[in-house]
Amino acid sequence: MTEFLAELIGTMILVILGVGVVAGVELKKSKAEGAGWVLVSIAWGLAVMLGAYAAGNVSDAHLNPAVTLGFAAIGDFPWNKVPAYISGQLIGAIIGAIIVYFQYLPHWRETEDKSAKLGVFATGPAVRSYPANLVSEIIGTFVLVLGLLFIGANELAEGLNPAIVGLLIVAIGMSLGGPTGYAINPVRDLGPRIAHAILPIIGKGDSDWSYAFIPIIGPVVGGVYGAFFYSAMFEGNIGAGFWITSVIVIIALIAAFFNEQKRVNQTASS
């Protein structure tokens, strides 16, 4: 098996199980309808764990462009492999979402809520505020990539890495996932969003492309910063990349804060 195929299959499994649990919870007349956020968070952790076990021996199971780019940025992964990895991840995510569509085929007809149908495939903010939504994705993915690196470096985790990473995903989902639904992975959102756009889902509405840049840019920035932060703080490699990404993250935080203050003032004056 090639690394490209391993990333494709691993990401496909991740999306089948992750998007699948959201479908079960959101779609009408599903046996899991209304089961809630805790189930979704746990299932996404298991989805990542099983995807990682599927691909780990071949490709180290990145399954996420934010991970691939973060590792490449600090020299832990060769840049010439990045296109194949990300291509495999995106294709796997699209295929996985299409499989979920067929798994729940009659339930699309039973579900009238367009936002629920889109929510099966793609993330969306609980409160739409692009600067704050971007920061949420940056922080979530920062924690993810930082966690992957310190888990990987810890001898106590040897042999259990995929399971512990799965628990990391559960923790991120429960603690940080509320504002945006925690994409923390560009292809986890983009692949299923493409599937939503092309599939003949009854009464589906639009695919909310105006929001789609948030779960792409946020995870990339957060993932790369998480890698530079680990390299700087844990390994002492404080270079230009760390300072540049630190400035970018600080600017994002300041922009989100002042945008929220502006909205608060507008609400108070209206």
Predicted regions span which residues?
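Membrane-interface helix-loop junctions and terminal tails of multi-pass membrane proteins
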Residues: 1-270
